[in-house]
Amino acid sequence: MDLGIRGRRALICASSKGLGKGCAEALAGEGVDLVLNARGAESLEATAASIRSTYGVSVEAVAADITTEAGQAAVLETAGDIDILVTNAGGPPPGLWSDWGRDDFIAAFDANLLTPIALIKASLPGMMDRGWGRIVNITSVAVKAPIPVLGLSNTARSGLTGYVAGVSRQVAGSGVTINNLLPGLHDTDRLVTLDKVDAGARGISED
């Protein structure tokens, strides 16, 4: 199926593995040129090289911590005028309500709320000027059905949902759409970690 996006340019965060990598491969399969970002340079470049070889699209890789101002500046400078933005970040650690303090919530908000907002604000003006843009935020099914051990994630991602609900309506007339993806269970490193934590807390085998 041709989605009509061949030749577009996309920035995809946390794209060296997992859902971000899957999004990158899907967009590359549609002929979209990519800017990939993750913190680990080695795995990021391996993913970029694989996509270049497989799909023949332009792929630039920026290893940086996207939750920092310096990291955002580096990624956005390389990305330039993008047509598609996919925000994505690893979820905060699981735990109990009594485990989390103010610093834990601030870290969760930085990664899963404030960073996507900063990238959206940086990308929207150009998209609106050109009359076309697609922004997709990978959040979690926990936004609709909160998961008890993921209180940090539940809180931050719900905040992003509220922000996007308002902004998407404000910019829809400019040819720009903003949507959230709420993935459920996928075979990723994140799910393996959560299973280990849950099994340990319940004193049972991971199997």
Each model region followed by its residue ranges:
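Conserved glycine-rich cofactor-binding loop
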Residues: 9, 14-18
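Conserved glycine-rich Rossmann-like NAD(P)H-binding loop of the short-chain dehydrogenase/reductase
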Residues: 30-47
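Substrate-binding pocket helix/loop in short-chain dehydrogenase/reductase
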Residues: 72, 96-98, 104-109, 135, ...
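Conserved mid-core segment of classical short-chain dehydrogenase/reductases
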Residues: 91-106, 129, 149-152
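Active-site helix of classical SDR
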Residues: 120, 156-157
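Alpha-helical segment proximal to the catalytic Tyr-Lys
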Residues: 125, 169-170
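Residue(s) in the substrate-gating loop at a strand-loop-helix junction
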Residues: 140
